[in-house]
Curated annotation (Swiss-Prot):
Keyword Nucleus belongs to the record: yes
Species name: Aspergillus flavus (strain ATCC 200026 / FGSC A1120 / IAM 13836 / NRRL 3357 / JCM 12722 / SRRC 167)
Main localisation: nucleus
Gene name in the database record: kojR
Protein known as: Transcription factor kojR
Gene Ontology annotations of biological process type: DNA-templated transcription; positive regulation of metabolic process; response to xenobiotic stimulus
Pfam families in UniProt: Fungal_trans (PF04082), Zn_clus (PF00172)
Applied biotechnology: Kojic acid can be used for several biotechnological applications, including use as an antibiotic, as an additive to prevent browning of food materials, and as an antioxidant. Kojic acid is also interesting as an inhibitor of tyrosinase. Finally, kojic acid has also been shown to have strong nematicidal activity.
């Protein structure tokens, strides 16, 4: 127990408040017991007290919540200290804090009163009306494709709310609404993942959503809808465009998430977000938004080799599992991948532990199996850096997970579901099989090549054809290198004992006929050639051709 001295110098013990107001209980803040308390005065909350209920028996340890760590006093104290530092840095919050001390009833709101000399009036460009692009029947059809393909993995929308918004939007077709960017993005993704020829207005829907979202980055009011729409735009760009475009969109998403305060649980929200926070946000929806945005930004940044957006004062808890979607499985996989952050100085044992955790995941959606496989291949690349001697057991497990991803990619291609890893996993898996360069790994090259060719037939884009030609040339390079090694061995046997020339010739012929060598390629290599596999292991294959309007569609 800590000791303090009063004005007379006598030592006194710190007294815990005998009661706490309902606001401090809800927000898990320390209450001084006054009515109104200091915390409620500071943040202009209504301060109310209720009589103490009768004491109940203590709950058993087995009934502790999964989020016990987030609710621990140490965690709450750490978050509280972080927020105090942020508020102390903020010049926009200080006038409010000063006003609360001088006159709690008339304190100014948190606002950038002297941020600059005043904003310029910017002309508002008229947006294309959604109802002029597609009919209600088309919107409902595209939304059904979205809910079938995208929603199970990235469940950031409530299906019932989406259907209600569609009905309301076409009930008043002339009036634009803040939900329009979501509807445009849902329609565009539904067109992309429909499995059919794209809707003729898909490009216009993407452009309309982009124009509306660009205004959210400079608007005074940011809503939950804007963060949701930015997530949907990131998914669309990750599926169709270059790495830079999807990375920029994912970073913008994270900044919108911070603006609405979605990275902090409602009971722990900081004063600095009071001018932009969306107070109407449902707790569970907010948590799903934050975690899905974090997954997208982190994984895109890792794969692209860029910095991710790291928010301060994060207190948002993971969402709860929900029937009909696998978003919590996605988040669990992301939490494992945090080990692979470039700033983490992982030992070999850490990476092997991460691989074991990836293996233990039981996933039922093919898009998640692709991500699981990609995570395993990433761990292999990190293992190559951490150690030059990877055990055969680890290599076998990597190959098994890579093959699972390959099979999932083929199934998704047959289902006409253009998830981005449908192209990337086969290409990366083939590169890693050649880099491992064991009899077991090389035995998978043939089936993997056949699968990649099948995927290329399903999605006949120049990008995929180029990727296929590249990996085939790498296989030929590996084949030629082994043939040259075989020639050296044959020649060495002939030079050692001329009398065994005939026998050596027979042996070399048997090797040449072996199925694992394949046909002789038309590429020649210098004697001292040694291929740098890291160049190809770090290469990402975009699903569509990079383009200004979202890339070339499959045919």
């Amino acid at each position: 127990m800590s000791l303090n001295t009063d004005d007379s110098g006598r030592i006194r013990t710190r007294q815990r408040a005998k009661r706490a107001c309902e606001t401090c209980k809800l927000r898990k803040r320390k209450c001084d017991g006054h009515e109104p308390c200091t915390y409620c005065l500071r943040y202009e909350y209504q301060c109310t007290f209720k009589p103490h209920p009768r004491r109940k028996p203590a709950a058993s340890k087995s009934s502790a919540r999964p989020s016990e760590e987030e609710d621990s006093p140490k965690f709450l104290d750490r978050v509280d200290a972080n927020q105090e530092h942020m508020e102390a840095n903020s010049g926009t919050a200080f006038p409010h804090l000063l006003g609360m001390r001088l006159n709690p009833q008339g304190a100014p709101k948190v606002y950038g009163f002297s941020w600059n000399l005043g904003p310029r009036d910017e002309p508002l460009e008229p947006f294309t009306n959604l109802t002029d692009l597609i009919s209600r029947e088309e919107m409902e059809d595209l939304a059904s494709h979205y809910l079938k393909k995208i929603h199970p993995v990235y469940a950031v929308l409530d299906p019932d709310t989406l259907r209600q918004k569609i009905v309301a939007r076409w009930h008043d077709p002339a009036t634009a609404a803040s939900y329009d960017p979501i509807l445009c993005s849902v329609a565009a993704l539904g067109s992309l993942y429909s499995g059919h020829q794209e809707h003729p207005k898909e490009g216009a829907l993407v452009q309309s959503a982009k124009e509306m979202l660009e205004t959210t980055r400079i608007s005074k009011t940011t809503l939950l809808h804007h963060a949701t729409a930015w997530i949907l735009r990131t998914i669309y760009l990750r599926s169709t465009n270059c790495p830079h475009a999807s990375w920029m969109a994912s970073c913008s998403t994270m900044h919108i998430i911070e603006a609405i305060g979605a990275h902090q649980d409602p009971e722990l929200v900081s004063l600095v977000y009071s001018d932009t926070a969306d107070v109407s946000v449902n707790d569970e929806s907010q948590r799903r938004l934050f975690w899905v945005a974090t997954v997208l930004n982190s994984w895109i940044s890792y794969e692209y080799g860029r910095s991710r957006v790291i928010l301060r004062g994060v207190s948002c808890k993971p969402p709860l599992p929900r029937t009909g979607d696998f978003t919590t499985d996605l988040i669990s996989m992301y939490q494992i991948s945090e080990r692979l952050d470039p700033d983490q100085n992982n030992k070999l044992s850490d990476l092997e532990d991460a691989l074991s955790r990836v293996e233990r995941l039981t996933l039922s959606h093919d898009a998640l199996i692709l991500s699981q496989s990609n995570l395993a291949l990433t761990i292999y690349r990190r293992l190559r850096v951490a150690s030059s001697n990877i055990s055969n057991d680890i290599l076998t497990r990597i190959i098994r997970l890579g093959n699972d991803g390959l099979e999932a990619a083929v199934r998704l291609a047959e289902d006409r579901s253009p998830w981005w890893h449908v192209a990337n996993i086969p290409f990366q898996f083939l590169c890693i099989l050649l880099a491992i360069d064991t009899r077991e790994s090389l035995s998978y090259v043939g089936p993997a090549l056949r699968s990649f060719r099948a995927i290329t037939r399903h999605y006949s884009t120049p990008t995929l054809h180029t990727a296929l030609e590249t990996i085939e040339s790498l296989v030929r390079l590996s084949q030629n290198k082994k043939e040259r090694d075989l020639t050296l061995l044959r020649d060495s046997m002939q030079q050692e004992d001329p009398g065994l020339t005939e026998q050596g010739s027979t042996t070399s012929q048997a090797f040449n006929d072996a199925s694992w060598l394949g046909a002789t390629g038309d590429l020649t290599l210098p004697d001292n050639f040694d291929w740098d596999w890291n160049v190809f292991l770090d290469t990402q294959v975009p699903f569509f051709d990079e383009g200004e309007a979202g890339g070339q569609r499959y045919r």
